[in-house]
From Swiss-Prot:
One record GO biological process: xanthine transport
A molecular function GO annotation: xanthine transmembrane transporter activity
Protein name per the record: Uric acid permease PucK
Record-stated family: Belongs to the nucleobase:cation symporter-2 (NCS2) (TC 2.A.40) family.
Species annotation: Bacillus subtilis (strain 168)
NCBIfam families in alphabetical order: ncs2 (TIGR00801), NCS2_1 (NF037981), pbuX (TIGR03173)
Chain coiled-coil ranges: none
Annotated TM spans: 18-38, 43-63, 67-87, 97-117, 122-142, 163-183, 185-205, 209-229, 233-253, 274-294, 310-330, 333-353, 369-389, 398-418
């Protein structure tokens, strides 16, 4: 995992990872901030501190030591699972209760990381491959919505947006076809640059936010006031954290497979503890809960660059732009259809890597086929028909609201069931 690159190459590879996750990273604070009634200054702080914490959380995971850090090329960002619960808690108990709940949830994850790490035995290849496929599939609607212009856009589905998005996809594929080596490894970055340049001449690039943004923003503890602790809010946020751990587990196993590393119970424990620390810090600095971002798995697979040094650069860039809002604003000029075009390739690679992980599974086994079929179908169903569980509330709503969780739990439960019926059956080809 420690390929040698010069400083410029590392910077470009790190920038590519940052741009891939940036839209997802700023979307959550924009949604939550608007819903809980933050003013412009507060919203600016929320976006800046979120980017800063994304970088800090990523660096925590890279720092593999005795107590925490999984040491895989993983990028952490704020989890979408937290959006609904944060808005609900803020509306019911006030903004300070949001951060009290995040602090408590992070602390519990840190303390219980050893217990969560023991769950590694429930993730054989037939489960991890299915989960990675589900993660990729669940992201495709996001890619297509972005390609069309972004949900709610006045120009959603316009010919200009569709041509621009698919043009970026085609450009990235052509780079992979005609080039090798470093050019191929930064194809996503080059696609984003080329797409933004084309969008500029189409009148779709706006630099006004860059001009208006400030130069420096310093993180503050308890920016929104001292936290308050409400038991229902804490329980809800703990469920959000558990959902995030499930999503992260699939990412960890995919990256471990890509980097030819076998994950142990201790590795997962340290990964979960680092994630718990990130959630805890997110609460202290009034940011968000954090999870492993799956889109970056696609970039690692596409670029073949598996070095943690690349991701360290990504983390440093995120910390830097979190301190310099003007730099953060510069990345927002990339039009949504351009991001969508790149996402199609990235998320598609996550799906294909899940399929590759399943290639080691005995597909002559009816049990394994049923595990894959049922988990992927239910995961996809919950993603594409979110109203399916609209009658649920509370904890059940949080858990059932994620197709990744539904699919993962299905795969784990079915694998345990078939192993009980046939304890000597093997998952892996011999």
């Amino acid at each position: 995992m420690k390929e040698q690159h010069n400083a410029l190459q590392l910077m470009m590879l790190g920038l590519q990872h940052m741009l891939a996750m940036y839209a997802g990273a700023i979307l959550v604070p924009l949604i939550v901030g608007a819903a809980i009634g933050l003013n412009a200054g507060q919203l600016t702080y929320l976006i800046a501190i979120d980017l800063f914490m994304c970088g800090a959380a990523t660096l925590l995971q890279l720092w593999r030591n005795r107590y925490f850090g999984i040491g895989l090329p993983v990028v952490l960002g704020c989890t979408f699972t937290a959006v609904g619960p944060m808005i609900s808690i803020g509306s019911t108990y006030g903004v300070p209760a949001i951060y009290g709940a995040i602090i408590a949830a992070g602390l519990i994850v840190v303390l219980a990381a050893g217990f969560f790490g023991k769950l590694v035995r429930f993730f054989p290849p037939v489960v991890t491959g299915s989960v990675v496929m589900i993660i990729g599939i669940s992201l495709i609607p996001t890619a297509m919505n972005n390609l069309a212009g972004g949900e709610g856009s006045k120009e959603f589905g316009s010919l200009d947006n569709v041509l621009l998005g698919f043009g970026v996809t085609a450009f990235i594929l052509l780079l992979f076809y005609f080039f090798k080596g470093f050019i191929r490894s930064i194809a996503i970055l080059l696609g984003l640059i080329a797409g933004t340049a084309a969008a500029y001449f189409m009148g779709k690039v706006d630099f006004s936010e860059v001009l208006e943004a400030s130069w420096l923003h310093v993180p503050s503890l308890f920016y929104f006031g001292p936290p308050t602790f409400e038991l229902p809010a804490v329980v809800t946020m703990l469920l959000v954290a558990i959902v995030s751990l499930v999503e992260s587990t699939g990412v960890y196993f995919a990256l471990a497979d890509i980097t030819n590393r076998r994950l142990s119970e201790k590795d997962l424990e340290k990964g979960y503890r680092a994630e718990g620390l990130a959630i805890l810090l997110g609460g202290l600095f009034n940011a968000f809960p954090y999870t492993a971002f799956s889109q970056n798995v696609g970039i690692v697979q596409l670029s073949k660059m598996k070095s943690v040094n690349v991701i360290a650069i990504t983390g440093i860039i995120l910390v830097a732009i979190g301190l310099v809002p003007k730099a953060a604003a510069l990345t927002t000029v990339i039009p949504t259809p351009v991001l969508g075009g790149a996402m199609i390739v990235m998320f598609g690679m996550v799906i294909s890597y899940g399929i590759k992980m399943l290639s080691s599974v005995d597909l002559d086994s009816q049990g394994n086929l049923l595990i894959i079929a049922s988990s992927v179908s239910l995961g996809l169903g919950a993603t594409t028909v979110p109203a399916l569980f609209s009658s649920l509330s509370g904890a059940a709503s949080v858990l059932a609201g994620s197709g990744i969780v539904i699919g993962s739990l299905t795969a784990i439960a079915l694998h345990a069931f078939f192993q009980t019926k046939q304890p000597n059956s093997a998952d892996i080809k011999t």
